[in-house]
C-alpha cells in the first residue's frame, strides 16, 4: 500500500519546521492527515484562453476541501502563440512546453503533493502539464478553460462566423477595405477561451478526453457557458476519490500511466485523425508518450492515418464550423462513439470518470442515449455577448445536430474522406517523416509537383510572399526553423495565411522543418525530419529543384539524383563550423535560454523531447 507522499512533510517530530510552514499557509492539525492536492492553474492576463482562470483554481480548491482534501494552488506560465506569432517571440513557444512540464514537476515534487488537478487551456500549456503528469505519475484530472465563442460579423449584408485566422488573412488581402479589416479584427475573438476552431489548444483539450484524463465535454463546452462550471467542480471531487483509491486501497489503476497506455494513445491519435486536429498534436502526443514510457512513434501514427477516416471538419478546414458546433453535435464523445461503431476504438480502457471508455460512451454519446440531461448538456450554445468572464451565460440551442450523414460529425460510412485528417509523408526530403493536415488540403492538390522556392527563415518567406516572389505552382521551402535550427520550431501561420490572401492557398505547397499553427490550412507540410540544422536533406534543396508530393501514396520526394545530393552534402560538410546553418546570418537574437533548449532538443519525429544521452558522463 503506497503512503501518501505528503506525509513526508506532515508527519514525524523532525518535520516540525515543515508543519510550521504549512500552518502559515492556513493548515490546521486536522489537515495533516488529509491528501494534499496541487491545483495547477495557468491564469494570466496575457492570454484570452487563460484570462478567466483567476478564480477557478480557488473554486476547485474549495470543492477539494469539501471532499476531504487539502488544496494548494500554484500557476504556470502560459504563452499566447497568436500574440507571439510572426516575430521572435515565437521562438519561445515550443520551449515553454518543457519549461511548464519542469515547473509542475518542481512544485509538485518539492512539496510532496499527492495528486493534481491541472487547469490548462492553450497551445503549450495542456501538453506541458500532460508531460508533467505522466512524468510524476500521481492521480490527476485535467480540466481546461474551454473554447472561445466564434466571432460573428456582417460583411456585404451577410453574417459570417469568424476566428483569429480570418483576421490575419483579411489583413493581408487587398480586396478588403480598412474598415472591413477593422470590423473583422474587432469581431474575430469575442470572448475568453481558446481560439474557436480546431486549432492546437482545442485539439489537445479534446485529446485529453480520448486519453481518459479529463471529463466528457472538456474539449468542446464553451468557456462562457454555465455548464462548464460543473466540470471544474467534478474534477475537484474526483481527484480526492482517486487519491483515496490509490493511497488507501492500493488501486494503481487510477495512476495516469495506467490510464494513458499505448492503446489510449492510439485512441487519442485516432480521434485526432478523425477530427482533423492540429499537426502540433503529433509533436505533443509523441512527447507525452515519451514521458509515460510508452513506445508510440511516427510509424504508429502513419499506420493509424491509413485506416481512420475523417469524420469532422472544423475551422480552419471548414471556415463556418467551430467548436460550439462540434459540441452541439455531441462533442468528442460523439466522435469517439462513431469510431467505436466502426471498430476503430479501444473502448475497454479506464478513464478518470468511468470504469471504461465504453461505459462513458453509453452515457455520453448522444447517438446511443436518450438521457435528457446529456442532451441538454450538448445543447449549450454561445451567448453572443463579448466577455472575459467564465460561466457567464446559459443559452441553449433549440435542437441537437444528430445528422451523421451530412452534419458536423459523420459516421464512418458517410465520412468526409476515407483517409483521415492527418497523414505522415516520407521520402528523401524527410527520411524520418513529416506531417500534413489533409483535412485542410484541397482535393485538387493532394498530388502536387513544383519547383522549390527556398527561404532560410520564416521572415524571409513572408517577405517573399508579400512581394510577389512566390508564384502559383511553387513549393515554398522554409528551413532552419526546426527545434534546433530556429531554435524553437516556429509556427508558420503567417506564411500560410499570406499565401491564402494572395490567392495561392490552393496553388502552392509549403514544406518546412518548422511547424504550423492549428489555424493553418492548405498544402502545408511541416515537421520535416531530420531538420536542416541536423543535416537533413531539406538543407540541400536549391531553388528550382523539383519536389513531388503525393499524399495518397504518403510520399514527398526531391527529384535530384542521389549522386548530386551526395556532392551537395560533401560541399556543405566542407564548410566546417558553418555547415548546416543559413547561408547568411539572420537578424535573430538567440538568448542563453534558447541556446540551452537547442543544445538538448531532438527532432520533431521524436516529439522534440530532450536528448538525455548528452548528459551521460557529464558532471
UniProtKB/Swiss-Prot annotation:
This enzyme's EC code(s): 4.2.1.9
Name the coenzymes or cofactors required: [2Fe-2S] cluster; Mg(2+)
Task: Say which enzyme class the record assigns.
Answer: lyase
One short Pfam name that applies is ILVD_EDD_N
Q: What does the entry give for GO biological process?
A: isoleucine biosynthetic process; L-valine biosynthetic process
Q: How is the cofactor bound?
A: Binds 1 [2Fe-2S] cluster per subunit. This cluster acts as a Lewis acid cofactor.
GO cellular component terms, alphabetically, are: cytosol
Alphabetically sorted, this entry's keywords are: 2Fe-2S, Amino-acid biosynthesis, Branched-chain amino acid biosynthesis, Iron, Iron-sulfur, Lyase, Magnesium, Metal-binding
A Gene Ontology molecular function term of the record? 2 iron, 2 sulfur cluster binding
Q: Name the family the entry cites.
A: Belongs to the IlvD/Edd family.
Subunit structure as annotated in this protein's UniProt entry = Homodimer.
Give the protein's function.
Functions in the biosynthesis of branched-chain amino acids. Catalyzes the dehydration of (2R,3R)-2,3-dihydroxy-3-methylpentanoate (2,3-dihydroxy-3-methylvalerate) into 2-oxo-3-methylpentanoate (2-oxo-3-methylvalerate) and of (2R)-2,3-dihydroxy-3-methylbutanoate (2,3-dihydroxyisovalerate) into 2-oxo-3-methylbutanoate (2-oxoisovalerate), the penultimate precursor to L-isoleucine and L-valine, respectively.
Q: What is this protein called?
A: Dihydroxy-acid dehydratase
Source organism of the structure: Sphingopyxis alaskensis (strain DSM 13593 / LMG 18877 / RB2256) (Sphingomonas alaskensis)
Biological classification of the source:
Bacteria, Pseudomonadati, Pseudomonadota, Alphaproteobacteria, Sphingomonadales
Amino acid at each position: 500500500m503506497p503512503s501518501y507522499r505528503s506525509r513526508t512533510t506532515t508527519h514525524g517530530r523532525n518535520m516540525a519546521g515543515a508543519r510550521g510552514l504549512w500552518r502559515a499557509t492556513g493548515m490546521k492539525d486536522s489537515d495533516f492527515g488529509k491528501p494534499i492536492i496541487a491545483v495547477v492553474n495557468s491564469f494570466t492576463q496575457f492570454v484570452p484562453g487563460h484570462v478567466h482562470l483567476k478564480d477557478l483554481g480557488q473554486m476547485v480548491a474549495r470543492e477539494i476541501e469539501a471532499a476531504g482534501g487539502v488544496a494548494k494552488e500554484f500557476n504556470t506560465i502560459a504563452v499566447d502563440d497568436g500574440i507571439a506569432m510572426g516575430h521572435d517571440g515565437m521562438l519561445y513557444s515550443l520551449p515553454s512546453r518543457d519549461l511548464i512540464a519542469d515547473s509542475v514537476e518542481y512544485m509538485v515534487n518539492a512539496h510532496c503533493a499527492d495528486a493534481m488537478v491541472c487547469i490548462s487551456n492553450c497551445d503549450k500549456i495542456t501538453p506541458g502539464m500532460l508531460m508533467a503528469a505522466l512524468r510524476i505519475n500521481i492521480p490527476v484530472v485535467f480540466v481546461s478553460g474551454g473554447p472561445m465563442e466564434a466571432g460573428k460579423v456582417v460583411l456585404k449584408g451577410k453574417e459570417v462566423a469568424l476566428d483569429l485566422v480570418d483576421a490575419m488573412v483579411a489583413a493581408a488581402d487587398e480586396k478588403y477595405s480598412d474598415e472591413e479589416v477593422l470590423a473583422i479584427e474587432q469581431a474575430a475573438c469575442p470572448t475568453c477561451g481558446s481560439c474557436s476552431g480546431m486549432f492546437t489548444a482545442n485539439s489537445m483539450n479534446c485529446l485529453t478526453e480520448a486519453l481518459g484524463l479529463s471529463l466528457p465535454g472538456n474539449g468542446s463546452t464553451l468557456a462562457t457557458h454555465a455548464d462548464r462550471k460543473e466540470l471544474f467542480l467534478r474534477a475537484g471531487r474526483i481527484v480526492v476519490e482517486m487519491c483515496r483509491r490509490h493511497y488507501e486501497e492500493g488501486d494503481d489503476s487510477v495512476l495516469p500511466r495506467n490510464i494513458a497506455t499505448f492503446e489510449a494513445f492510439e485512441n487519442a491519435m485516432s480521434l485526432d485523425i478523425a477530427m482533423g486536429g492540429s499537426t502540433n498534436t503529433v509533436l505533443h502526443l509523441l512527447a507525452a508518450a515519451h514521458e509515460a514510457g510508452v513506445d508510440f512513434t511516427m510509424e504508429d501514427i502513419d499506420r493509424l492515418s491509413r485506416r481512420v477516416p475523417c469524420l469532422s471538419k472544423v475551422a480552419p478546414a471548414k471556415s463556418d464550423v467551430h467548436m460550439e458546433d462540434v459540441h452541439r453535435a455531441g462533442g468528442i464523445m460523439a466522435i469517439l462513439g462513431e469510431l467505436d461503431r466502426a471498430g476503430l476504438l479501444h473502448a475497454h480502457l479506464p478513464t478518470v470518470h468511468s470504469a471504461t471508455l465504453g461505459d462513458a460512451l453509453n452515457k455520453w454519446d448522444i447517438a446511443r442515449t436518450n438521457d435528457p440531461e446529456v442532451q441538454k448538456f450538448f445543447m449549450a450554445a454561445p451567448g453572443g455577448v463579448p466577455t472575459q468572464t467564465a460561466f457567464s451565460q446559459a443559452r441553449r440551442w433549440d435542437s441537437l445536430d444528430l445528422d451523421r450523414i451530412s452534419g458536423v460529425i459523420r459516421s464512418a460510412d458517410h465520412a468526409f474522406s476515407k483517409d483521415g485528417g492527418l497523414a505522415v509523408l516520407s521520402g528523401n526530403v524527410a527520411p524520418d517523416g513529416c506531417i500534413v493536415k489533409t483535412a485542410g488540403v484541397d482535393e485538387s492538390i493532394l498530388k502536387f509537383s513544383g519547383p522549390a522556392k527556398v527561404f532560410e527563415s520564416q521572415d524571409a518567406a513572408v517577405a517573399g510572399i508579400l512581394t510577389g516572389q512566390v508564384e502559383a505552382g511553387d513549393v515554398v521551402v522554409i528551413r532552419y526553423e526546426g527545434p534546433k535550427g530556429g531554435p524553437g520550431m516556429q509556427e508558420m501561420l503567417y506564411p500560410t495565411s499570406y499565401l491564402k490572401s494572395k490567392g495561392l492557398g490552393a496553388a502552392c505547397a509549403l514544406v518546412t522543418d518548422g511547424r504550423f499553427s492549428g489555424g493553418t490550412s492548405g498544402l502545408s507540410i511541416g515537421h520535416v525530419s531530420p531538420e536542416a540544422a541536423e543535416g537533413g536533406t531539406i538543407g540541400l534543396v536549391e531553388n528550382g529543384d523539383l519536389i513531388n508530393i503525393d499524399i495518397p501514396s504518403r510520399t514527398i520526394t526531391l527529384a535530384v539524383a542521389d549522386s548530386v545530393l551526395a556532392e551537395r552534402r560533401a560541399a556543405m560538410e566542407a564548410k566546417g563550423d558553418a555547415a548546416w546553418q543559413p547561408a547568411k546570418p539572420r537578424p535573430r537574437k538567440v538568448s542563453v535560454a534558447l541556446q540551452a533548449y537547442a543544445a538538448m532538443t531532438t527532432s520533431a519525429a521524436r516529439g522534440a523531447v530532450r536528448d538525455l544521452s548528452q548528459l551521460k558522463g557529464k558532471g
